[in-house]
Structure formats: C-alpha cells, structure tokens
C-alpha cells in the first residue's frame, strides 16, 4: 500500500508529532508498505532519505509560550498538486489537520482516501495561531476525512467540538526495542546520588519552575541528590539557570538537547522520572518512555497524563503547580527503593500495551476499513485485518 504521512511541523526539529510520524514510517516500512512523509523542513532529513517530500518553508512562530514551526505560505498548491499527481497514494494520513496551512491544502487537492489524526487540544502550542481559520476550512472539507483518530480522550473531546462524528482513539506508542531496561546508564552520574530526571522543552507549561522549587525542598532533606534537566533550550533556559545560581541550588545539571539514541540512557540513569506539566498535554509520551525503561514516575494529575498512568501503580501523581506536594512525592520515592523497583516493574508492564508495533497495526486496520467502504470499495487481500493484527 502506498501511504502518505503529512505533518504541518518542521520535520527537521524533533517533537511529539514528528516522532509519532517517524514511528509510523518505521513500522509501515517494516510491514512492506511504500511510505512517503510530506512536511516542511528547514534543513535535510537524513533519517528517512528519499522517502521525505519537503513542501513549504517553516517559520518559527511564538505561540502559547512555545515555538511553533510551520509553513504559512499561501502558495503551496502547485507543489502539492504535482506531488499528489505523481505519487498516486492509496491513503493520505494528515496529522494535526487543524494546524495551518499544509494539511488543509493537501486535503483540498487530495483525490484519494484521507485519514486525520488529532494529537492536541485547545491551549496546546500553536493553537492560538491560525487554528480558528484552519478549523473553519477543515469543517468545510470534513467530508473528505474518511477516518478520524484521536490520540487520547482529551484530544477527541476538543476535536469533536469542531469536527463532529466518530473518532477512533489510537494512542501514541513507544518503541520497546529502543526504550529498554537493558540500556547502559550514563557513567558520570553513577556516583551514589539519587538522580531525578526531567525531559522536555524548557517551556512554562512543562512546569520546570515548579520542579526547581520542589527540588530545593528535596535537596534540603536529601543532600546526596541530583536533578538532571534534558531538553532543547528556549529563552527560559537562561532564566532557569539564573534562578539556580542565585538560589545557590547545587547539583542541577542542564544537559540540553539529547539525541533520540542517547535518551534511553538518561531514563536508565534516573532513579525517578518527574514531569510536572501544568496542563495542555493531550498525552504523556515521556511517561511511556520512562516506564519502558523501568523508571518510576512522579507526574502531575492532568488529563493527558491520567490516561497513561494510574496513581500508586507506575508512580505517584500530584496536583499541578503544587510544589510542596511534588517535593513530598519525590521524597517518598527517594526513601523507598523497593517501592521504586515495584513501580518501575509495573511501568514496564504498562508500556507493553503501547508498543509501536501494536499501535501501527491498529492504524493500518483503520486504513483497510476506510478503503473497503464506499466510495473506494477497494480490497487488499494481502493486508486484511487478520494479517494486519498478527
């Protein structure tokens, strides 16, 4: 089957949607399908080679305390028409159809079956820029979306307010061959200190300021502890580093951007993974990554995280923006190594449910279902639902 995966975001910059598409590309290619990724790109994308089709030049746009890298060109039509006519896709799978401008333009000129995956919800980065117009355009073209996927119930609730109808909830996945408990920890952090790990962009909504305040309380009670901050910097990084210096807080390591290959080693190095996001998260991908490696989690009890983990099972959940509660949860796990091991083992079991192999098969089954119905009524005997779920 020939499949197009369309991203509105700069494919040269890592992020949740980009990583999701890369995972589907890997799995579908392994299944024997002919996959192309269509997206804007600020530079080359060597990871997928000639399977990548660049359309549009992304621009960095400040949005919701983040940077949204999308193409806002109104002159995409000639390139889109040429690509669609040449490639003749069986399925076009649009990711974040609400985001301007690429997905709505591809949908306009598509003459094949179209699927949309809705990853985020109102308040997510970029959704205060352009999405009301895109939502109106998408509503007018909604009949061209033959299948709608939401990665979580919060994402579905938001999307269905604007594009009503049936949604299949198919979550994000985790690559269990990559995020594995068998990876080696980072040697320089193996000095007897209890390591707390944060992974994410240094944006206000990720809650690092609350973790720094909580860690100040933790450090006072457990001097032999360390906070490792992993993630691409933003304009807030200098502010956070200045706060750490002025407060005299020791053992806070800003590791900066870490490659996908190196990331599992950070999770393995951590005794506790902490994600204190304040909201606007439709799904907890970083939770799954930590769980897959066997690291217990301390997370805020927000909608996107509550759908992935259970309080007291894979870790502990606290109210968002409650620094003292966050510190208390961290201290509880730091003082109880058997509990950490127990929660880590439960997390690994939970992560098995989100194996990208399983998730990709669920998505592919929807492709088959859509193509077997009017107006397509196409049959792919070699890819029936039984073989897809094998």
Give the location of each predicted region.
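Nucleotide-activated donor-binding/catalytic signature segment of Leloir-type glycosyltransferases, i.e.
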Residues: 238-258
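Carbohydrate-associated surface elements
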Residues: 154, 173
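Short hydrophobic beta-strand element within catalytic cores of glycosyltransferases
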Residues: 296-299, 309
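Acidic donor-binding loop of glycosyltransferase active sites
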Residues: 268-282, 295
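Short alpha-helical donor nucleotide-sugar binding micro-motif in glycosyltransferases
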Residues: 257-258, 266-270
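Conserved acidic donor-binding segment of nucleotide-sugar-dependent glycosyltransferases
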Residues: 311-312, 316-323, 332-337
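Membrane-proximal helix-turn-helix segments that form the acceptor-binding/catalytic region
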Residues: 131-148, 155, 161-162
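Conserved donor-binding/catalytic core segment of Leloir-type glycosyltransferases
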Residues: 188-216, 228
